Amino acid sequence: MNSRLCYLLFRPRLLRSRGAGVLSVPETQRVTLARVRHEESNSAFTNSTLRSDVGHDTGLGLSFCRSFSTEAIGQLQSTHYHLVYTCKVCSTRSMKKISKLAYHKGVVIVTCPGCKNHHVIADNLKWFSDLEGKRNIEEILAAKGESVRRVEGSEALEIVNEESRNNPDEQKPAHLSDGSDKT
């Protein structure tokens, strides 16, 4: 990706010296130019290439442009998971966006939109003693003989009961069995 940043430093009208017709730069402008050149020499960008150009005096102002290009180092990592699950209480299928940090190092509790029940998805801080040391939904369901399917391309966790995966029509809730499948 190439980017170009340009800064235009305007100064008041250049004064013409009385003798030889030479342009003179006021003291404040010399300090600004010196500061710009100092910043150019001290600036270093580790992940980009930098080229600085100081324009010539055109009588309108001093132009200062920086051109740099940055290239992605590796891939950007998503910071969230999309949790897709079916509530066992009311059979509502829903999707929630949860933080990866909370899932792996904190506590995640989601609320079912159908029955308003709270479901523990992850407990890495050991807040809930009834989980018997299990830290996340994958470990909780593995102890019950169920599985969690990870879909890496879309950063999603899908909770699927093994029986419903083998017999999808038998486990379908009554409000979805009439052919009006929600997606």
From Swiss-Prot:
Compartments, record wording: Mitochondrion
Keyword Zinc belongs to the record: yes
Transit peptide, start-end: 1-62
DNL-type ZnF: 76-173
Annotated Gene Ontology cellular component terms: mitochondrion
Any one of the GO BP annotations: protein stabilization
Region called Disordered, residue ranges: 160-183
Source organism, top-level taxon: Eukaryota
Main localisation: mitochondrion
UniProt KW keywords: Chaperone, Metal-binding, Mitochondrion, Transit peptide, Zinc, Zinc-finger
Residues at which Zn(2+) binds: C87, C90, C112, C115
Residue ranges, compositional bias (Basic and acidic residues): 162-183
MF GO annotations: protein-folding chaperone binding; zinc ion binding
InterPro entries on file: Mt_import_TIM15, Znf_DNL-typ
Biological role: May function as a co-chaperone towards HSPA9/mortalin which, by itself, is prone to self-aggregation.
Name of protein: DNL-type zinc finger protein
Organism: Danio rerio
